[in-house]
Amino acid sequence: MGQKVNPVGLRLGINRNWTSRWFPSARTAPSNIDEDNKIRKFLKKELYYAGVSEIVIERAAKKLRVTVVAARPGLIIGKKGVDIEKVKDGLKTLIKKEVSINIKEVKHPQADAQLAAENVATQLEKRVAFRRAMKKVMQAALKSGAKGIKVCVSGRLAGAEIARTEWYMEGRVPLHTLRAKIDYGFAEAMTVYGIIGVKVWIFKGEVLQKGIQFEKKEEAKEEREPRRSRRGRQ
């Protein structure tokens, strides 16, 4: 089942944490979920240029704190913090509450699954060949320290009449290993032929208890060509 489910949801409480952190009552749960959805949609739309990887929402008593993890935090903050204040005012108008916003930087943007998926989607919208876009992202992730990466695209690839799915994989991506730290990202490319879905899985190593990184010593192997699927027409 590791290949079917969302790898982040499967590892919650093991080596991944929730992106919405609050304890609601039965009365407040629906409104909180709807509010979180509005906040995420608003920030994704307003900060599309900054490479937003993750949005974490925390609630404590009557306080609401939003943490935005982005590849280019300087663009969000702006000169003397002018731009971040505009975003904060927009959020206050949207949800009618006081909000505090924290900005964090992605340490290795090229090894971030969400940013990689959005990168492939952007290239597809610019009519770059899908195989070239996939391989370019995979090479960048491996150079940034990823242990393995899998990229999957689905839709009317290259304008084909019949939709199909193709994927490439390099390195190891152990989806069934719960201690494996798997990053997952999804994006959609709006092309003239229709929507193309992009999924990216990035393996960043194994994590044991107390956050210890564990790497197996493997014998040197000859470099092999990246594997690709046999589904659909090649």
Swiss-Prot record:
One GO MF term: mRNA binding
GO annotation (BP), single: translation
Swiss-Prot/TrEMBL keywords: Ribonucleoprotein, Ribosomal protein, RNA-binding, rRNA-binding
Entry keyword Ribosomal protein: yes
Domain of life of the source: Bacteria
Gene Ontology CC terms: cytosolic small ribosomal subunit
Residues covered by the KH type-2 domain: 39-107
Known role: Binds the lower part of the 30S subunit head. Binds mRNA in the 70S ribosome, positioning it for translation.
Family to which the UniProt record says this protein belongs: Belongs to the universal ribosomal protein uS3 family.
NCBIfam families: rpsC_bact
Subunit structure: Part of the 30S ribosomal subunit. Forms a tight complex with proteins S10 and S14.
Descriptive protein name: Small ribosomal subunit protein uS3
